[in-house]
Protein backbone atom coordinates (compact mmCIF):
# COMPACT_ATOMS: atom_id res chain seq x y z
CA UNK A 1 0.00 0.00 0.00
CA UNK A 2 1.26 3.45 -0.89
CA UNK A 3 2.40 5.42 2.15
CA UNK A 4 1.59 9.05 2.91
CA UNK A 5 5.12 10.12 1.96
CA UNK A 6 4.95 8.24 -1.34
CA UNK A 7 1.72 10.04 -2.22
CA UNK A 8 3.33 13.39 -1.51
CA UNK A 9 6.45 12.51 -3.53
CA UNK A 10 4.29 11.84 -6.61
CA UNK A 11 3.46 15.55 -6.67
CA UNK A 12 7.16 16.33 -7.22
CA UNK A 13 8.61 13.44 -9.25
CA UNK A 14 7.21 10.61 -11.34
CA UNK A 15 9.56 7.86 -10.17
CA UNK A 16 8.95 4.78 -8.03
CA UNK A 17 9.93 5.24 -4.39
CA UNK A 18 12.20 2.44 -3.17
CA UNK A 19 12.78 3.60 0.41
CA UNK A 20 11.36 6.05 2.95
CA UNK A 21 13.38 6.67 6.12
CA UNK A 22 12.51 9.16 8.83
CA UNK A 23 15.46 11.29 9.95
CA UNK A 24 15.42 12.19 13.63
CA UNK A 25 17.11 15.06 15.42
CA UNK A 26 15.12 18.04 14.17
CA UNK A 27 13.16 20.15 16.64
CA UNK A 28 10.47 21.58 14.37
CA UNK A 29 9.73 19.69 11.14
CA UNK A 30 9.40 16.00 10.28
CA UNK A 31 12.10 15.03 7.80
CA UNK A 32 12.32 11.93 5.58
CA UNK A 33 15.03 10.56 3.31
CA UNK A 34 13.46 9.42 0.04
CA UNK A 35 15.15 7.07 -2.41
CA UNK A 36 13.68 7.05 -5.92
CA UNK A 37 16.34 6.71 -8.65
CA UNK A 38 18.25 9.24 -6.61
CA UNK A 39 17.97 10.64 -3.10
CA UNK A 40 15.73 13.42 -1.87
CA UNK A 41 14.68 15.07 1.38
CA UNK A 42 10.96 15.40 2.09
CA UNK A 43 9.72 17.57 4.96
CA UNK A 44 6.37 17.93 6.65
CA UNK A 45 6.53 21.51 7.93
CA UNK A 46 5.14 22.63 11.26
CA UNK A 47 1.73 24.10 10.45
CA UNK A 48 1.73 26.33 13.50
CA UNK A 49 4.87 28.08 12.31
CA UNK A 50 4.64 28.09 8.54
CA UNK A 51 0.98 28.70 7.76
CA UNK A 52 0.56 32.20 6.37
CA UNK A 53 4.29 32.86 5.95
CA UNK A 54 5.29 30.65 3.01
CA UNK A 55 5.70 33.58 0.62
CA UNK A 56 8.19 35.32 2.91
CA UNK A 57 10.22 32.14 3.35
CA UNK A 58 10.14 31.47 -0.40
CA UNK A 59 11.27 35.04 -1.13
CA UNK A 60 14.29 34.70 1.17
CA UNK A 61 15.18 31.30 -0.28
CA UNK A 62 15.13 32.62 -3.84
CA UNK A 63 17.34 35.55 -2.83
CA UNK A 64 19.81 33.19 -1.19
CA UNK A 65 19.82 30.79 -4.14
CA UNK A 66 20.54 33.69 -6.50
CA UNK A 67 23.38 34.93 -4.29
CA UNK A 68 24.92 31.44 -4.23
CA UNK A 69 25.22 31.60 -8.02
CA UNK A 70 27.08 34.91 -8.07
CA UNK A 71 30.70 34.71 -9.32
CA UNK A 72 32.30 35.43 -5.93
CA UNK A 73 30.32 32.62 -4.31
CA UNK A 74 31.59 30.03 -6.78
CA UNK A 75 35.33 30.32 -6.16
CA UNK A 76 35.15 27.34 -3.81
CA UNK A 77 32.69 24.46 -3.71
CA UNK A 78 29.40 25.63 -2.16
CA UNK A 79 25.93 24.13 -2.35
CA UNK A 80 22.51 25.66 -1.94
CA UNK A 81 19.69 23.23 -1.08
CA UNK A 82 17.68 22.84 -4.30
CA UNK A 83 13.99 23.03 -3.52
CA UNK A 84 11.85 21.16 -6.02
CA UNK A 85 8.60 22.32 -7.58
CA UNK A 86 5.37 20.37 -7.81
CA UNK A 87 3.72 19.65 -11.14
CA UNK A 88 1.78 22.87 -10.61
CA UNK A 89 5.00 24.86 -10.19
CA UNK A 90 4.90 25.41 -6.42
CA UNK A 91 7.63 24.78 -3.88
CA UNK A 92 5.12 23.90 -1.15
CA UNK A 93 2.35 21.32 -1.31
CA UNK A 94 -0.67 21.25 1.02
CA UNK A 95 -2.37 17.88 1.42
CA UNK A 96 -6.04 17.19 2.19
CA UNK A 97 -5.33 17.29 5.93
CA UNK A 98 -3.82 20.76 5.67
CA UNK A 99 -0.22 19.60 6.22
CA UNK A 100 2.46 21.56 4.34
CA UNK A 101 5.22 19.67 2.53
CA UNK A 102 8.48 20.54 0.79
CA UNK A 103 10.99 18.41 -1.11
CA UNK A 104 14.57 19.06 -2.17
CA UNK A 105 17.47 17.12 -3.60
CA UNK A 106 19.70 15.32 -1.13
CA UNK A 107 23.18 16.81 -0.78
CA UNK A 108 25.99 14.30 -0.20
CA UNK A 109 28.23 15.31 2.64
CA UNK A 110 29.42 14.71 6.17
CA UNK A 111 28.27 16.12 9.48
CA UNK A 112 30.53 18.07 11.82
CA UNK A 113 32.81 15.65 13.69
CA UNK A 114 34.30 16.80 17.01
CA UNK A 115 36.85 13.99 16.78
CA UNK A 116 38.63 15.99 14.07
CA UNK A 117 39.47 18.58 16.72
CA UNK A 118 40.32 22.14 15.86
CA UNK A 119 40.55 21.48 12.10
CA UNK A 120 36.78 21.02 11.78
CA UNK A 121 36.18 23.98 14.09
CA UNK A 122 38.36 26.18 11.87
CA UNK A 123 36.47 24.94 8.78
CA UNK A 124 33.12 25.55 10.51
CA UNK A 125 34.18 29.15 11.14
CA UNK A 126 35.35 29.50 7.56
CA UNK A 127 32.06 28.09 6.29
CA UNK A 128 30.10 30.58 8.38
CA UNK A 129 32.28 33.39 7.06
CA UNK A 130 31.63 32.27 3.51
CA UNK A 131 27.91 32.14 4.19
CA UNK A 132 27.91 35.71 5.52
CA UNK A 133 29.81 36.89 2.44
CA UNK A 134 27.22 35.22 0.20
CA UNK A 135 24.33 36.66 2.21
CA UNK A 136 25.67 40.15 1.54
CA UNK A 137 24.50 39.58 -2.04
CA UNK A 138 20.86 39.11 -0.97
CA UNK A 139 18.43 41.98 -1.55
CA UNK A 140 15.29 42.79 0.40
CA UNK A 141 15.55 39.90 2.86
CA UNK A 142 12.40 39.70 4.98
CA UNK A 143 12.10 38.75 8.64
CA UNK A 144 9.81 35.70 8.65
CA UNK A 145 7.35 36.23 11.49
CA UNK A 146 7.62 32.64 12.84
CA UNK A 147 11.34 33.16 13.51
CA UNK A 148 11.36 36.89 14.25
CA UNK A 149 12.15 36.43 17.94
CA UNK A 150 14.78 33.70 17.81
CA UNK A 151 17.31 35.82 19.73
CA UNK A 152 14.91 38.24 21.43
CA UNK A 153 15.53 37.98 25.16
CA UNK A 154 12.68 40.35 26.10
CA UNK A 155 10.17 38.32 24.08
CA UNK A 156 11.08 35.06 25.80
CA UNK A 157 11.37 36.61 29.25
CA UNK A 158 7.83 37.96 28.90
CA UNK A 159 6.59 34.49 27.92
CA UNK A 160 8.33 33.13 31.00
CA UNK A 161 6.91 35.63 33.51
CA UNK A 162 3.42 35.31 32.00
CA UNK A 163 3.30 31.62 32.92
CA UNK A 164 1.10 31.33 36.00
CA UNK A 165 -0.87 28.08 35.82
CA UNK A 166 -1.62 26.95 39.41
CA UNK A 167 -0.54 23.35 38.75
CA UNK A 168 2.78 24.32 37.19
CA UNK A 169 5.75 22.68 38.88
CA UNK A 170 8.61 25.16 38.71
CA UNK A 171 12.29 24.42 39.25
CA UNK A 172 13.43 26.74 42.03
CA UNK A 173 17.09 26.71 40.98
CA UNK A 174 16.25 27.87 37.47
CA UNK A 175 13.78 30.53 38.60
CA UNK A 176 16.41 31.92 40.96
CA UNK A 177 19.10 31.95 38.24
CA UNK A 178 16.84 33.65 35.70
CA UNK A 179 15.77 36.39 38.11
CA UNK A 180 19.36 36.97 39.22
CA UNK A 181 20.86 37.24 35.74
CA UNK A 182 18.15 38.67 33.50
CA UNK A 183 19.22 42.32 33.78
CA UNK A 184 22.86 41.44 33.16
CA UNK A 185 21.93 39.47 30.05
CA UNK A 186 19.66 42.24 28.76
CA UNK A 187 22.51 44.73 28.99
CA UNK A 188 24.70 42.83 26.49
CA UNK A 189 24.15 44.38 23.05
CA UNK A 190 25.86 43.91 19.68
CA UNK A 191 25.81 45.65 16.28
CA UNK A 192 23.05 44.57 13.87
CA UNK A 193 22.22 45.41 10.25
CA UNK A 194 23.40 42.23 8.50
CA UNK A 195 21.73 39.25 6.84
CA UNK A 196 22.27 36.06 8.86
CA UNK A 197 21.38 32.40 8.82
CA UNK A 198 19.55 32.68 12.14
CA UNK A 199 20.34 29.16 13.39
CA UNK A 200 24.00 28.69 12.47
CA UNK A 201 24.83 25.73 14.71
CA UNK A 202 27.25 23.17 13.26
CA UNK A 203 24.38 20.68 13.03
CA UNK A 204 23.09 22.82 10.15
CA UNK A 205 26.40 22.61 8.24
CA UNK A 206 27.59 19.97 5.83
CA UNK A 207 31.19 19.10 5.08
CA UNK A 208 33.06 17.44 2.20
CA UNK A 209 36.64 16.28 2.63
CA UNK A 210 36.86 18.38 5.77
CA UNK A 211 35.57 21.58 4.15
CA UNK A 212 32.24 23.23 4.99
CA UNK A 213 30.26 23.29 1.74
CA UNK A 214 26.64 23.93 2.69
CA UNK A 215 24.15 25.21 5.25
CA UNK A 216 20.77 23.53 5.53
CA UNK A 217 17.60 24.74 7.31
CA UNK A 218 17.77 28.13 5.62
CA UNK A 219 14.19 29.12 6.55
CA UNK A 220 15.60 31.25 9.36
CA UNK A 221 17.59 33.55 7.02
CA UNK A 222 16.71 37.06 8.17
CA UNK A 223 18.09 40.50 9.06
CA UNK A 224 20.10 40.40 12.28
CA UNK A 225 23.56 40.51 13.82
CA UNK A 226 26.52 38.38 12.73
CA UNK A 227 27.09 37.90 16.48
CA UNK A 228 23.87 35.86 16.62
CA UNK A 229 25.26 33.39 14.09
CA UNK A 230 28.73 33.39 15.65
CA UNK A 231 27.25 32.73 19.08
CA UNK A 232 25.02 29.92 17.78
CA UNK A 233 27.99 28.36 16.02
CA UNK A 234 30.34 28.71 18.99
CA UNK A 235 27.73 27.35 21.41
CA UNK A 236 27.46 24.21 19.29
CA UNK A 237 31.19 23.44 18.94
CA UNK A 238 33.23 25.41 21.50
CA UNK A 239 31.60 24.30 24.76
CA UNK A 240 33.25 21.42 26.64
CA UNK A 241 31.56 18.51 28.39
CA UNK A 242 31.33 20.54 31.62
CA UNK A 243 29.45 23.33 29.88
CA UNK A 244 32.42 25.71 29.86
CA UNK A 245 33.72 27.68 26.90
CA UNK A 246 36.90 26.26 25.33
CA UNK A 247 38.71 29.44 24.32
CA UNK A 248 41.23 27.60 22.16
CA UNK A 249 38.39 26.23 20.05
CA UNK A 250 36.82 29.69 19.87
CA UNK A 251 40.06 31.19 18.54
CA UNK A 252 40.18 28.54 15.79
CA UNK A 253 36.54 29.24 14.97
CA UNK A 254 37.25 32.97 14.64
CA UNK A 255 40.38 32.39 12.57
CA UNK A 256 38.31 30.37 10.13
CA UNK A 257 35.59 33.01 10.14
CA UNK A 258 38.06 35.80 9.35
CA UNK A 259 39.52 33.73 6.49
CA UNK A 260 36.05 32.96 5.15
CA UNK A 261 34.60 36.47 5.11
CA UNK A 262 37.54 38.78 4.41
CA UNK A 263 38.14 40.09 7.94
CA UNK A 264 34.55 41.08 8.61
CA UNK A 265 35.05 40.70 12.35
CA UNK A 266 38.28 41.52 14.16
CA UNK A 267 39.85 39.27 16.78
CA UNK A 268 39.65 42.28 19.12
CA UNK A 269 35.89 41.63 19.33
CA UNK A 270 36.46 38.28 21.06
CA UNK A 271 35.54 39.44 24.57
CA UNK A 272 32.24 40.92 23.39
CA UNK A 273 31.52 37.69 21.54
CA UNK A 274 32.21 35.65 24.68
CA UNK A 275 29.68 37.74 26.60
CA UNK A 276 27.20 37.28 23.75
CA UNK A 277 27.72 33.51 23.70
CA UNK A 278 26.68 33.50 27.36
CA UNK A 279 23.61 35.57 26.50
CA UNK A 280 22.85 33.19 23.62
CA UNK A 281 22.98 30.23 26.02
CA UNK A 282 20.82 32.09 28.54
CA UNK A 283 18.12 32.85 25.94
CA UNK A 284 18.08 29.26 24.70
CA UNK A 285 17.92 27.94 28.26
CA UNK A 286 15.04 30.31 28.97
CA UNK A 287 13.25 28.97 25.89
CA UNK A 288 13.75 25.33 26.93
CA UNK A 289 12.54 26.05 30.47
CA UNK A 290 9.50 27.99 29.26
CA UNK A 291 8.64 25.17 26.87
CA UNK A 292 8.99 22.68 29.73
CA UNK A 293 6.70 24.70 32.01
CA UNK A 294 4.05 25.48 29.41
CA UNK A 295 3.98 22.08 27.73
CA UNK A 296 3.81 23.93 24.42
CA UNK A 297 6.01 21.33 22.73
CA UNK A 298 8.00 23.67 20.50
CA UNK A 299 11.10 21.56 21.19
CA UNK A 300 10.61 17.85 20.63
CA UNK A 301 11.75 15.62 23.49
CA UNK A 302 13.33 12.17 23.26
CA UNK A 303 12.35 11.55 26.89
CA UNK A 304 10.07 13.28 29.40
CA UNK A 305 11.86 16.17 31.08
CA UNK A 306 14.58 16.53 28.45
CA UNK A 307 13.82 20.22 27.93
CA UNK A 308 14.21 20.85 31.66
CA UNK A 309 17.56 19.05 31.62
CA UNK A 310 18.75 21.15 28.69
CA UNK A 311 17.60 24.31 30.44
CA UNK A 312 19.59 23.38 33.58
CA UNK A 313 22.76 22.82 31.56
CA UNK A 314 22.43 26.13 29.72
CA UNK A 315 21.30 28.29 32.63
CA UNK A 316 23.44 27.00 35.48
CA UNK A 317 26.86 26.61 33.79
CA UNK A 318 28.51 29.98 33.21
CA UNK A 319 31.34 30.87 30.89
How would you label these PLM feature ranges?
Residues 1-21:
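Juxta-kinase regulatory segment immediately upstream of eukaryotic protein kinase catalytic domains
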Residues 17-35:
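ATP-binding glycine-rich phosphate-binding loop
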Residues 21-25, 44, 51-55, 110-122, ...:
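ATP-dependent phospho-/nucleotidyl transfer catalytic cores
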Residues 41-48, 218-219:
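Active-site ExK catalytic segment of metal-dependent nucleases
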Residues 208-255, 262, 298-309:
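Active-site Asp-x-Gly
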Residues 283-319:
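ATP/Mg2+ or Mg2+-diphosphate-binding catalytic cores
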Amino acid sequence: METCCEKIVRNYIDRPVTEVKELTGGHINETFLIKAEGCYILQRLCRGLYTGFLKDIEHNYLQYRKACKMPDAGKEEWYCPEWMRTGEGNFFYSDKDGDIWRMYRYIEGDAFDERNGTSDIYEAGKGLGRLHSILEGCNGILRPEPFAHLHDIDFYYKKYIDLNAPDMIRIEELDRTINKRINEMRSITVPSGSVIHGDAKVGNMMFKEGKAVCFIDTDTIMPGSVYDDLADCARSCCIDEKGCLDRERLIFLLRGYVDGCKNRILMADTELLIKYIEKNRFVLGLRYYTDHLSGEGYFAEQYSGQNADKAKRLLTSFL
